[in-house]
Amino acid sequence: MAKEPVRVLVTGAAGNQEPILVKEESVVGIPTPLLKLKSWQWWVLVSVNIFFLIGGQAASVLLGRFYYDEGGNSKWMATLVQTAAFPILYIPLLLLPSSASVESSESSCSLKYIVLIYVLLGVIIAGDNMLYSVGLLYLSASTYSLICATQLAFNAVFSYFINAQKFTALILNSVVLLSFSAALIALNDDADTPSGVSRSKYIVGFVCTLAASALYSLLLSLMQFSFEKILKRETFSVVLEMQIYTSLVATCVSVIGLFASGEWRTLHGEMEGYHKGQASYVLTLVWTAVTWQVCSVGVVGLIFLVTSLFSNVISTLSLAVTPLAALVVFRDKMSGVKIMAMLIAIWGFASYVYQNHIDDLKVRQARQQAQAGRVEPPC
């Protein structure tokens, strides 16, 4: 009889229990070589995935802003490139050894339900990407990133209602601070906007970006709900498959939108009129698509190596890096209000992380006490 794998549950910042990878323990669906990693090797992998996530997200936002600045104007094309390079994710998926455990998970959940989940989530992703594209069209890269940081606050709210997670004082503090940060950006009369963008379009961009952040957080909660209640497993292969097939659906929706809106007719003229030339136009779109998938690899990798909560927190941290990168690349204006908003957002982020740290310590201490109790001989 096979030994039952050990699953260590770590309580996240919002009270949610999630599996965390521990080197010495056997976890369902995780390749054996990974379990044999030494501590420094595990940290190297975590660091590489953090770099992929932060670097990929910052680069994709900057390239998206560059596309608009240099003459690009197709919102559906900007939406399409956010998921179009999803075949890259087949590389790590194909490297995973096939196992009976994966097959049993598929048989435990009807194929039609899995397809329905992927289609619904894919459509939501496409709509979310469109909102992000509109937001980036009317906002500077730094302002856009600061508003996107509110996704952590929305995530706490949706997790409370959908995933039954706790709402602690520190989490509430984080939600309030991130809300204040977004409000400062919204009320900033000295807001820097791309050339030709009116105040009304700035407001549209703000609302679309805020709505996109909320929708993205809802998407994360729905994915977590799908893993826990329907798929009933969260292994690397299952997470990666969801990322691939939802991106496939989102890409199809974006292509349909591109043709249905008639924007495809303007693409040739857009490429010819691109300020940096036609080659630069193609390379900008290609590298935007690639960097978004590099970001996705980082997200999935951190879910695999640590937890989905940690992956989301690092994703939010990367949004604080983008304004600094935009300051260097695009010379974005950093007004006093924007600096204050960024500091408040970092404070809210730190509050969220600290709550996660406290909960993590409690679970680790409880686990150590339980292990010590099993080892000690009876008196």
Curated annotation (Swiss-Prot):
InterPro entries in the record: PUP_plant
Record-annotated membrane-spanning stretches: 43-63, 76-96, 114-134, 144-164, 167-187, 203-223, 239-259, 294-313, 314-330, 334-354
Record GO terms (molecular function): purine nucleobase transmembrane transporter activity; purine nucleoside transmembrane transporter activity
One Pfam family matching this protein: PUNUT
Membrane topology value: Multi-pass membrane protein
GO cellular component, one term: membrane
Protein name: Probable purine permease 11
Native source species: Arabidopsis thaliana (Mouse-ear cress)
Organismal lineage: Eukaryota, Viridiplantae, Streptophyta, Embryophyta, Tracheophyta
